[in-house]
């Protein structure tokens, strides 16, 4: 670098950096391209040096000249000439939509073809033809640059950056990961020509995936008809999907409208060197056309070829200018025009004999003249036929080209351009017997041949032309008209068929999309079924885990049985205590009632409310807060119809003394009617303040109290002023079961169910089983706070009694109100409706319902806290009985309705660890009330809780485990709908099928070779599976549902058979060449201790290059079909190597990132390499090219691809 002075950086591309420098020796400007080869091995560096040496020896006016190359600081520097005119890409952008002239396009294209021919003739591939690599000099000469560099950089990451930066020039075989060949350069050449004609890329798409699909389909917008048919036809040939159908660069240069421009850009000596390099016999006889003054084209430049080919030594006749006169030219011209090369020597012999015989005798001359006339006549007939055939062939090619431009691939018939090519190959020189002269020489002299034909008709053939040619002309004209009409009809029918095919193709696309969606949906359903089946079965292959699971199941069953037995024992004990306390309370009430009746009889003149207040227990509270009549309360909950019956049964059990006092009570009621009316009004006003919508019914009840009393008298029952007395006095038998709040009924709600007439049912139990409206749940907790703490001391003895039953967990926070306060706390009101609602569909424990309640509970400030005090003087006894009654209700529901094993199932992820540690907390009395921390911990949405409650397994254990034997949880409905609407059933799960139609053999290789344990695979892919199976991020982990399960028996047998097949028949998967490459790569890996690059990226051996060569006639160098058949094997093998070298997680991350960028229409694909290199790091940066090829090939084979 000391010989050059850096001026500025002018670009960066596949090669690395390009720097403009100035030479200190000659002062000229050069471009130095810096290539980083530090990552290459020594062998690859040697190969790179040889390649650069070959490139430096190429000298051609249309190729950027290499001056020298050297290495410094781990980089390869290539010095080449500087083109001041910029590149063709900038020139196209400078047009700003104005199309180029066809002559300008063809001039540039011919120069590009000449440069590419120079490269291809030396069996070197360019591999990076694009408008940015085609440069313009000051005088407008086109020079091709950067050729061969992609071959040098075959194993570096820069090649991958090239593919990302300029994906518009990729050929279908590259997208399909097939070997690169010379026809891939032809495809890129067609892309450049299309860009010159339209100023746009032939294949454009919003993302890489769609671009690859467009390239594979081979459909491109048609070129403007402003350009000639020859140019459009050439373009369609360059864009053939099959590489063997594309012409070679030599065939392109043989076309007439291309060949006539060669002379403008190459000197005669260069033309001779370039075109004689391949076949010397082609251009040996070509000085003949050079003498014609009318041609003015480059064919006359073949005269200097005498010095190189030495035609005198070959043909025995010196080729000089004076040897060929105008007369001989006239004789030699028509045969090549008539395509009768084999008759040229015969004509020549006939003319020599004619001259000899004319000098000898006139008779012989006349006979020869007659023979010559006959031959000329036949030649003319053949010429006319040839013209007609050529016209028909041209029309046919034009129709094919139109169909090709419209994108219909099925219209083409076999051998599209073979006939034309063959006809031109049949042309040879006048002296040479070779049938391989260039097509361009014949077509260029059509005008000269016609002029000579006219001169011959006027001078030498006037006699026989008038007789014979005149006789054939009318018939010939009629034939032409008929052929033209037939061609027009055929063209119309052809266009009609094309329209029908277009319509049928559109219908076929719709059918295909429907079938593809069905296939994807079927695959998705099958995977879900297999996943559910695998998750639900025991793991046969893993004996230890199976045994542990069985032991855990047995332990859970035993634990549940013991819990159930304990629950039943507790329920029995509590029932016995409840019965005993009920009897004691009943006896106490009986005695109190008798004393009360005696006192009322003795002091009948004393007002009844005062007597009741003296015996009521809590006068101060009754003075402050109004008394709620039990009639009004029971009517509100729908018990007004059954109240009388219940009262009858309770009164019959109370005492026979009650019936004997009925008359006395009736007289007392009549005497105290005025006082009762006054008192009733006060109670009525108090009730209206609390429950506003009951005013009218209360008022009617109080006004019609006398008639109501009569109704009770007619029934033969005890008549008691229930509306005027307190709750404990009027209904002492049921005071043990009364809940301490007013039940407010929604006026618009559905009517309540009628309770059965069972004398053993308590009010508390009925209220607990009743289906309450929302108003009963919306009580304000703060309104009861003082009452709860005020009464807390009254229940301490009861808690002491229950401690021997171990019904209170030590770990529960004492600040939370325990079960003894539930008799007047609104939390019990929350439990009851939830419990009844939960039992409608599926029985569950009370703890689950309490945890779900706060998400739907709202406070209602409309209910004042003055309704709490309905306690009687027998407060402690009533509270004890109510507590026991509630416990009995809960325990009976647990025993009767709950499924064994449902203990703590739905809330196992939400429970406090302290509660889980208690062996009996699962069935505790306090299960209906959780500590405050548990209520704060509930952050899940209601839908998620419902899904968890529905899909919880009965065998689920209490502690949280990472592995679960429960059936799988169904995916969220929303995520399923999204998957159905988008069709992406298998896009995000790496364990699913990668494409719709191809098996993922990488999993098979991974199973046979990597053999990771099931647990390891699960831990590695846990995060990915969680993202798929659990759409709600705040929800609990679904890791137990995504355990990588062992396959069932059928899948194991399939894997075993495929493993045996792979071991016994390795030759079936790869061809011999591929096997040798794999073996050699394995040897290199063993020697170096690292994974060598894939064989397609290793330029060190010729057999390992992912290249092949296609000639014009593919018979001579036909590539083995095994290479195409094993494309899938290449892909899966490449996938396997990448997973082994990088690790599955990193490989999958990079793969998905590249795929996402390719599919994102808004993403700039040029930044893909930077992002991916940051993920890969320096260690795996060289693998980017392989990952890119894999992504592109997967996208190519994923959709419909016929070839």
UniProtKB/Swiss-Prot annotation:
Acidic residues bias (residue ranges): 839-850
Gene3D superfamilies: Phosphorylase Kinase, domain 1, Transferase(Phosphotransferase) domain 1
Top-level taxon in the UniProt lineage: Eukaryota
Residues the entry annotates as binding ATP: 10-18, 33
Entry's EC annotation: 2.7.11.1
SUPFAM superfamilies listed in its UniProt record: Protein kinase-like (PK-like)
Keyword ATP-binding: yes
Tissue-specificity statement: Predominantly in testes (germ cells and Sertoli cells). Lower levels in ovary (oocytes and granulosa cells), thymus and lung.
Residue numbers annotated as active site: 128 (proton acceptor)
Cofactor: Mg(2+)
Biased composition (Basic and acidic residues): 674-683
Name of the protein described by the UniProt record: Serine/threonine-protein kinase Nek1
Organism whose genome encodes this protein: Mus musculus
